[in-house]
Amino acid sequence: MKNIHCINHPLIEHKLGILRAKETKPFQFRMLIDEISSFLLFEASKDFSLKEIEISTPIQKTTVKKLDEKIMICPILRAALGMLESVFKMIPDASVGFLGFVRNEETLKADFYFQKLPKDAKKRTAIVIDPMFATGGTAIDACNFLKSQGVKKIKFISILAAPQGLKKFSQMHDDVEVFVACIDEGLNEKGYIIPGLGDAGDRVFNTL
């Protein structure tokens, strides 16, 4: 699966270990999500195009580079809201396109209930963020929707992923690069990633 990138780094592994622990407090959990998301965004943005502009330093004029792509961050509600701030810190001029999915506990599928994209969404590079990439169903539906709206370039960032979900996603969207911090063992009978870290949304918002 050439479109799947698992980012290996000692600091990511260290932070993941704390993130997984059930004793980790909500404020720590949010901080770790933010930090790991920054690592992943750094990798996902390596091929962003640049343009040269002229500026004046306090000493003289010079040519510098700046992003030449319009970026749209697409958090999948609600857990991905914990990742949003880290992306904003690195790309403050990005627009946000919200995608709302709710998990059906009986079918283990996600129902699409809300979307709000920028008017110029099809002109932007979409960075979809969701901390957990489990069955792949939500990711597939999110990318299906974005493509239906004319979005040409999509990247996906997740903290943890299950191999089953990644394989299923790659069969449907091999043109979408996925960046994850860790690929776990798999899924349990309820469709949760194992060993995982529990329900990311509940841990971010302290609603356990």
UniProtKB/Swiss-Prot annotation:
Q: What regulates the activity here? A: Allosterically activated by GTP.
Q: Which InterPro entries match?
A: PRibTrfase_dom (IPR000836), PRTase-like (IPR029057), Upp_B (IPR034332), UPRTase/APRTase (IPR050054), Ura_phspho_trans (IPR005765)
Task: Name one matching Pfam family.
Answer: UPRTase
Q: What is its EC number?
A: 2.4.2.9
Q: How is the cofactor bound?
A: Binds 1 Mg(2+) ion per subunit. The magnesium is bound as Mg-PRPP.
Cofactor(s) named in the record: Mg(2+)
What's an example Gene Ontology biological process for this entry? uracil salvage
Keywords associated with the record: Allosteric enzyme, Glycosyltransferase, GTP-binding, Magnesium, Nucleotide-binding, Transferase
Task: Report residues binding uracil.
Answer: 193, 198-200
- Catalyses which reaction(s): UMP + diphosphate = 5-phospho-alpha-D-ribose 1-diphosphate + uracil
Which GO molecular function annotations are given, in alphabetical order? GTP binding; magnesium ion binding; uracil phosphoribosyltransferase activity
Give, as one word, the top-level EC class: transferase
Q: In which pathway does it act?
A: Pyrimidine metabolism; UMP biosynthesis via salvage pathway; UMP from uracil: step 1/1
Cysteines paired by S-S bonds: none
Q: Which Gene3D superfamilies match?
A: 3.40.50.2020
- Give residues annotated as binding 5-phospho-alpha-D-ribose 1-diphosphate: 78, 103, 130-138, 199
* Family, as annotated: Belongs to the UPRTase family.
The record ties this protein, via PANTHER family, to:
ADENINE PHOSPHORIBOSYLTRANSFERASE, URACIL PHOSPHORIBOSYLTRANSFERASE, CHLOROPLASTIC
Any idea what job this protein has? Catalyzes the conversion of uracil and 5-phospho-alpha-D-ribose 1-diphosphate (PRPP) to UMP and diphosphate.
Alphabetical list of HAMAP family matching this protein: Upp_B
Fetch the NCBIfam families from UniProt: PRK00129.1, upp
This chain's protein is named: Uracil phosphoribosyltransferase
Organism listed in the record = Campylobacter jejuni subsp. jejuni serotype O:2 (strain ATCC 700819 / NCTC 11168)
